[in-house]
Structure formats: C-alpha cells, structure tokens
C-alpha cells in the first residue's frame, strides 16, 4: 500500500502531483519502505514518470454501490485479500466515456488510518508498453458527494512491478480502459 497521503482535491494541482512523485522517489530510495530489491535500490536514480498533465485530471461522477458482496480479489500470489466494490466512477476523457470501479479493502477499512480509503486499480493501452503490464493503482478517499477527482498523474505501480516477492491485486477486467493514460509512473525496467 502506497504510504504517501492520498488526495482529495477538486482542481488540478501541479504541486500535489510533484509532491507525490517526489515522495515515491524518496520512499523507494530508502531502505525501510522500498519495494525495490537491494540491487535495484543501490542503483536507484528515481522512477520514470510520464510528464505531469492537467489533461489527466478528471472530475468523475460517483455512484455508491452499497449492495455489493465482499469477494476475494485475485493477486499475483496466493494471498486473496477481501474487497468490496464500493462504487462506480464515470468520466469523459478525450471525448470518450469511461467507467471505473472503486474498491474497499475490508481489513484495512477497520483501521483508523484507512477507514475512508478506497482503491482504484486500472489498466490502459500503455500497460505492457510504457507502463507496468499489470496496471497501476490510485489511492483515494471516500467522496463526500456525488463527484470525485481522479488525478492519473498520481498513479503508481504495484510493488510486484519492482520485486516478485510481493503479492499484488490484479486489476479487475472491468477496470481496463480503452485509452492511453500517459500519466503517473511508467514501467520500472524490462
């Protein structure tokens, strides 16, 4: 789980995206919380990001789906964390309409620090090319109304993109976007 503060902004904020990227680089360079292997950490110069762009900051319509049943989310390993679909986001990007599902980790939601945290995994047409093949994640807070800001500039790779010892949630097929999201972290290395 990404440890930098999640955002709850309603307008594009270049500084917020820059802070997120800087925090990722600081975390990954450090010994304590880095998902990198020791060899990669010793040679780490910083993550490769797409250029920050206001184009990839969208205000989505939020619809709560409160009748969803908890389920075990598939991961890259044997672990099966229990999630619940929390809601749906609909938005327009480059003149096309899209929908993404938001999820809540049941165990994490019981902890004070994460009681209002939601998980937004997605894949797109850059996945496997310029970005990690398994998709990327954005951490968000439960919205207070019927809209939510999505800043794709703050998208990050799952830990398993850097180190195979991690077990990461696999992006559900419903969250595969038929568009290039040229924002956030690029793939680490081949």
Language-model segments: residues:
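Bacterial Sec-dependent N-terminal signal peptides
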Residues: 1-12
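Start-of-domain marker
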Residues: 10-58, 63-67
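Extended, aromatic/histidine-rich regions of cofactor-dependent oxidoreductases associated
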Residues: 14, 156-190
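Short acidic/polar mixed-charge low-complexity motifs
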Residues: 54, 94-98, 146
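A mature extracytoplasmic/lumenal domain signature
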Residues: 62, 102-104, 124-126, 152-156, ...
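Mid-length scaffold segments of soluble, non-membrane domains
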Residues: 66-133
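Acidic, glycine-rich flexible loop segments
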Residues: 119-156
């Amino acid at each position: 789980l990404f440890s930098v503060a999640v955002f709850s902004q309603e307008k594009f904020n270049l500084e917020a995206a820059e802070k997120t990227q800087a925090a990722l680089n600081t975390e990954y360079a450090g010994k304590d919380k880095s998902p990198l292997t020791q060899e990669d950490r010793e040679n780490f110069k910083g993550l490769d990001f797409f250029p920050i762009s206001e184009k990839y900051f969208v205000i989505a319509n939020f619809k709560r789906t409160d009748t969803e049943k908890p389920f075990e989310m598939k991961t890259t390993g044997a672990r099966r964390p229990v999630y619940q679909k929390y809601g749906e986001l609909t938005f327009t990007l480059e003149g096309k309409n899209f929908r993404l599902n938001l999820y809540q980790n049941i165990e994490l939601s019981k902890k004070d620090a994460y009681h209002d945290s939601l998980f937004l995994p997605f894949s797109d047409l850059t996945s496997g090319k310029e970005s990690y093949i398994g998709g990327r994640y954005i951490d968000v807070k439960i919205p207070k109304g019927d809209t939510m800001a999505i800043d794709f500039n703050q998208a990050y790779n799952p830990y398993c993109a850097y180190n195979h010892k991690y077990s990461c949630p696999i992006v559900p097929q419903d969250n595969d976007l038929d568009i290039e999201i040229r924002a956030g972290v690029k793939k680490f290395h081949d």
